[in-house]
């Protein structure tokens, strides 16, 4: 075993690993943002449900203020739902990019594994040839001594 294994495409593998790590970070950020928007939407909907009940003890001014607040909440809910849709699309897109990056890295990883297995097989073959030669020389020496 004379040489150490060196993968010829190691720089490409490193590049693919960095790309995958970057895609993971982008995906996690997109997922975090989507979850934040979902929580915001849930809070707005809860607030809308809480204030949408009509109280007969309220004055006309209070009812008008409540009506304006509910309209504001409703428009904010609509805006937040649109933002949630765009965030869900972003999550789908970043997930697809992440899967592509993982596949690309795995392809190069498989190439490395196959190359390393071939290297080890060749090293073992060379070592076996050397062992056979040593055994042959030892046998010839023993035959010569007799």
Language-model regions, residue ranges each:
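Charge-rich amphipathic alpha-helical interaction elements
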Residues: 1-146
């Amino acid at each position: 075993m004379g040489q150490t294994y060196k993968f010829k495409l190691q720089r490409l593998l490193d590049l693919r690993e960095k790309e995958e790590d970057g895609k993971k970070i982008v995906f996690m950020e997109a997922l975090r943002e989507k979850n934040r928007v979902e929580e915001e939407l849930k809070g707005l909907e809860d607030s809308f449900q809480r204030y949408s009940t009509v109280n007969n003890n309220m004055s006309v001014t209070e009812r008008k203020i409540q009506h304006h607040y509910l309209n504001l909440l409703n428009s904010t809910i609509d805006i937040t739902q649109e933002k949630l849709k765009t965030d869900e699309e972003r999550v789908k897109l970043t997930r697809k990019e992440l899967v592509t990056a993982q596949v690309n890295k795995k392809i190069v990883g498989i190439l490395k594994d196959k190359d390393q297995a071939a290297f080890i097989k060749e090293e073992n073959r060379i070592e076996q040839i050397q062992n056979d030669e040593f055994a042959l020389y030892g046998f010839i020496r023993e035959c010569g001594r007799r």
